[in-house]
Regions:
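Short, Lys/Arg-enriched N-terminal segment that forms or immediately precedes the first helix
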Residues: 1-15
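N-terminal helix-turn-helix DNA-binding core of bacterial DNA-binding proteins
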Residues: 12-55, 75
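Basic amphipathic alpha-helical segments that dock to polyanions
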Residues: 56-58, 62-63
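Histidine kinase transmitter module recognition
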Residues: 28-31, 72, 90, 94-97
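Short, charged/polar surface micro-motifs in flexible loops or helix N-caps
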Residues: 31-35, 62, 87
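Amphipathic alpha-helical dimerization/coiled-coil segments
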Residues: 6, 92-114
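Basic, amphipathic "hinge/linker" alpha-helix immediately C-terminal to the N-terminal HTH DNA-binding motif
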Residues: 76-95
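Beta-hairpin "wing" of winged helix-turn-helix
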Residues: 64-75, 82
């Protein structure tokens, strides 16, 4: 039985709706907690994308409201975040979806002779 991924079914790719910045933040947090500046630096190194503070903190707020990340106790003036178990599960589903679409796209390019 196929799962309708548009209606909240198990395995739904909830990250399709939150944007690239949110996905990059989850990927960055997958190897451990980070505060805002560390996230900006890691994402720039990882993906060549420099998130501005408004984009970063807007995405952090959305991810926290969705329960995909959580804040940790502040260290001095820094406020670290970590990925939650539901956040890690959502990231896995999203990355699996990207891999399937990427493989299909590559196959179609090959079959099309492009």
């Amino acid at each position: 039985m196929a799962v309708d991924r548009r209606d909240g079914g198990a395995g739904q790719d909830v990250l399709r709706r939150v944007g690239e910045a949110s996905v990059l933040i989850l990927i960055s947090l997958a190897d451990g907690p980070k505060h805002g500046y560390a996230l900006i630096q890691d994402i720039k190194e990882l993906a060549g994308v420099e998130l501005g503070p408004g984009t970063l903190y807007g995405a952090l707020d959305r991810l926290e409201r969705l329960g995909l990340i959580e804040p940790l106790p502040a260290e001095d003036r820094r406020h670290p975040y970590r990925i939650t178990a539901p956040g890690a599960a959502a990231l896995r589903v999203h990355l699996d979806s990207i891999e399937r679409v990427s493989a299909a796209g590559r196959l179609r390019l090959q079959l099309g002779g492009i």
